[in-house]
Amino acid sequence: MKKQFQIAGLAAALCTVAAGCVSAPPAMDYDKLTADIIKTSFRDEGIVKVTVLDTDETAKACSAADVMGKPLDEKIAKAIEEINLKTVKWPADGKFIGDWKEGEKIAQNGRGLTYSDDGKTPNGGNCYNCHQITKEEISFGTLGPSLYSYGKIRGVTDPRSAESKAVVAYTWGKVWNAKAYNACSNMPRAGHMGILTEGQVRDIVGLLLDPQSPVNQ
């Protein structure tokens, strides 16, 4: 809790500095004005609530750094990563590796979380929007690094072995909450934000690490 207050205070300080001229209104006033305008411009619709626009201290700190056009302070970044690492929910049954075939379907699927969805259909991961994953799929984004050969280049031949434990745990944590390892990562916090279920995260990890997955062929 103490670190959360520290991050909030530092983020506020960054925003104030970003305001520039002393005679101008404080930057935080602009932030509040913008937030108020946005909230009054939207309404709840279907499963989507206006609260989806709310941001936590992690997002605020990263946004403040963007305003300044500088990397996040190293100490703040470390504190953010520690806070987010604590939110990672490890598999209840201890099983990290799921069905890579299902993982591929999730990676290809970009549906979900819109007002026209009923909330009953599982969300997609939309992973190909930012990553190359298999060589068969030629339509992919490049915002994130290529994940092709993800397990192979990390020497994972048996993802269920003790030797692979560290890589497997890291991969699970990265999918669950990427900001646990990179404070201002552009990658969605898929598990933490409820975009993907525990089972879906398991299948995505399987897609990335199973030697039989086309990712590692």
Task: Give the role of each language-model region.
Residues 1-9:
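Bacterial N-terminal signal peptides that target proteins for export
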Residues 95, 119, 139:
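Residue-level marker of regulatory loop/turn positions in helix-turn-helix DNA-binding domains and
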